[in-house]
Amino acid sequence: MTHTGGMHFGPRGRLIAIALAVLVIVGALSIGGVLAFGPLFPAANAQPTVDLVSKKTVARSLTSPWGLAFLPDGSALVSERDTGLVRRIAGRSNGSPARSLTKTSTVGTVKGVRAGGEGGLLGIAVPPTPRGTQPEVIFAYLTTARDNRVVRIDWDGRSLGRQTPIVTGIPKNTYHNGGRILVDDDVLYIATGDAGIPELAQDRTSLAGKVLRVDFDGAPAAGNPLDGSRIFTLGHRNVQGLALDAAGRLWATEFGTSKADELNLLRPGRNYGWPVVEGRSSKRGFTNPKVTWSPTSTASPSGLAIQDGAAYVASLRGEVLWRVPLKGTRAGKPKAVDLGEQSRLRTVAAAPDGRLWLSTSNTDGRGDPGSRDDRMLSLIIND
């Protein structure tokens, strides 16, 4: 059975799936540098957990929220996959008291969005700016009638303006559209899916099944592994999480089939195996993941954030926020953050005030939405 983006399981099914889960950690040493990582067999009532210090709801009644990016004033832009709207959620200043619900407004509609299946308005990214200034543009990844593409949108601090395509022709399908984008200084990383055609992930002439690295005009970025190519890494099935650690290393989460989901450390020009291999392999020419979740019912990792030496992975089918300790290029044993609820989780991001923001994804057609879903949560985690 193919795992696309996360079929929904009821509470009983989730407990059975987790009870049977085998969580495989790929790495040589533990964070302490003494014990070798080994497989973990978590029981449904005994999986390791991390406690919350605080959880607040900062926004409600969002429709299939997908992308999340922060502006310099601490407010957040949120893309809604199925409506094409970009919403703005007020933030909080450093040192100000945490608020629960904050003001949410609509700043515009991204033109050309054709929502359907896993496609629609997906990732959103904000470039860095000097302190005290607003960005003049933002970036968005969307599915159109013909393709997936990335656009640059003028931004005046209040609303969306002119829209300019910078990368077009990314193959689209009902499933496996990728969609996460990430700004690093003057470079934009773009995660694409294989569009349901696995062999495209190994095709260097196709933009599908890749992580791309481009400048703000969509041209191949200086220093790319292949001159004149936008491709940074290849061999991906469906990457939907991208994050940089404190040393500037790029990490990614990737959906597998029913076999294994992955947390990967991305290195320029590396091949991550799909569809030749999935999960860990001894085959030459492919780079192994740092962590795998197997079976995929325990994860379906969509969002990724890195904060204070740990990766946080938002999972759809697993309905869990996973915390994975990082030390350099090594990844430790994942633990589930005790959120006190079970919801499909789409996106997690580190906020400027040191909190984590986390979006639920119960209105995406595969969940059981409540009357005020979807929500944006603000978390402080006991690490």
Predicted regions and their residues:
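Surface-exposed loop and turn segments in beta-propeller and other repeat-based domains
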Residues: 102-116, 163-177, 216-233, 271-296, ...
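Repeated scaffold domains used in trafficking and secretory/extracellular systems
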Residues: 344-347
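Hydrophobic core
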Residues: 24-29, 35
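Loop-centered beta-sheet repeat module
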Residues: 205-215, 222-247
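N-terminal export and membrane-targeting signals
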Residues: 3-25
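Blade/loop signatures of beta-propeller domains
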Residues: 33-53, 95-98, 209, 219-225, ...
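Short edge-strand/loop segments of extracellular domains
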Residues: 145, 256-261, 265-272
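Acidic, Gly/Ser/Thr-rich repeat motifs that build Ca2+-stabilized beta-propeller blades
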Residues: 33-197, 249-256, 298-328, 333-338, ...
